[in-house]
Amino acid sequence: MKFADGFWLNQRGYEVNYANQAFEIEEIENGFLVVATPFVVYNRAMMLGSANLEIAYTSTQENCVKVSITHHKGHVDNGPHFVLEDKGFKPQVTVTDKEAVLVTGDTKLVVSKENWSFTYYYKDKKLTSGGWRSTGVIF
């Protein structure tokens, strides 16, 4: 679906909010949770009424990273539901003031706190990355 009109304009009727800052990063089971905001936030009050995204990066198997992006959690869960194999794998998670790192086998994910960017590595070789306008929500 085309929602952009050229490179910098949006089509009429669409409001697009891109992640611009990793405001908060919290370590969770098997990974970390990022609260991404569409603009630079200096305090929690600035987040009211904005299109904040919760992005969970987790890993339950070696060299596999699961990414879940949520804008609104309130919904009826009608499935489908599948039983996933859990081998008890625990990735290495490091959260610092500047970045969060998830290491699962030979795969590494680095999320920057200063501006919105994430990079995937495999055996210390850069696979792919995302930054400005890579993650967002469309109304």
Regions found by a protein language model. Give the residues of each.
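N-terminal accessory segment at the very beginning of proteins
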Residues: M1-F139
